[in-house]
Amino acid sequence: MIINQRDDRHAQVIDAARRMLTAIRTAPKAKGNDLIEGAIVEGDDLRRLSDAMLELYAETSRPVYQRDAANILQGDAVVLVGIRPQPMGLNCAHCGFPTCADKPAAVPCAFNSIDVGIAAGSACSVAADCRVDTRTLFSAGMGAMRLGLLPGCRLVLAIAVSATSKNPFFDRK
């Protein structure tokens, strides 16, 4: 049997995306509290995510949503990393409020945001090891939250993933 890379490209990207999910799960977390969630979006769900981003563009007139909605369709998948918000109870004031009790519920604990960033960075590191191209997008994360793709998560980043001869996430207009 001969497996042509061009024919197997999607499966290779999904394999890398699965490894990225492992990196998300094993990334260090504040106080060891695992509040992180991850998922892979592909196929028809990738189109749904793009459509949700176009809805955000229509509502906000922010061009980033329109540009990124088209851009994610140039890849094979999007890896989502999100967090179920929970204050760490450290009263560190890193969020801008003196104590956790003073912090409004709508304001995320700074450590929740840090944990999502660390997990996304860990996932992108694995993607680089697999030699697939990525782009971390807040816009696609907003679309994912709109669709409820990571239930309970109020902060979501999306990592678009591709394995083509030219990185589709690099020269964007």
Residue ranges of predicted features:
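Acidic, surface-exposed loops and disordered segments
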Residues: M1-K173
